[in-house]
Design a protein with these regions (language model features):
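Aromatic-rich, lipid-facing transmembrane alpha helices and their immediate juxtamembrane interface loops
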Residues: 1-142
């Protein structure tokens, strides 16, 4: 029971950290955000952090960034389908951007997420190390 409680607290902390960071990034660049972005950010942060736990081999930092950009883009696409297409809330629309998919995601933002994911990976690793007392992170660049 204690392990279940500790995992709940851990993933709640990670979810809130990712959610508020994602929302904060949106507010910095767009001037506003939407609650769906807090949910998307929390999910993304947890999934990015699970890369270290799911893959048994020592994944290079660049590879983690590629996977993270894919994860963020996929989550943003799914949230966009629900929020923008199904619920018609029109929170964002990338249809004017080149290389977009249904106006929900585009190549430019996938590349931006690739770069920003470095900070997410490092934040997750050090949050887990310093606050949650998990293993010390180490990195292989390539």
């Amino acid at each position: 029971m204690l392990l279940l409680y500790n995992n709940f607290l851990k993933y709640t902390l990670l979810f809130l950290t990712g959610g508020f960071t994602y929302g904060g990034i949106e507010i910095l660049f767009r001037g506003y955000s939407h609650v769906s972005m807090l949910v998307a950010g929390g999910i993304c942060f947890i999934l990015i952090g699970l890369l270290d736990e799911v893959f048994p081999w020592n994944m290079a930092l660049i590879s983690q960034m590629v996977f993270s950009a894919g994860i963020i883009t996929a989550v943003e696409f799914l949230v966009g389908l629900v929020v923008n297409v199904w619920l018609k809330l029109n929170v964002w629309d990338y249809s004017a951007m080149p290389y977009n998919i249904m106006g929900q995601v585009c190549l430019l933002y996938t590349n931006i997420w690739f770069l920003l994911s470095l900070f997410g990976i490092l934040a997750d690793d050090y949050l887990r190390y310093y606050i949650l007392k998990e293993k010390k992170p180490h990195y292989k660049i390539l």
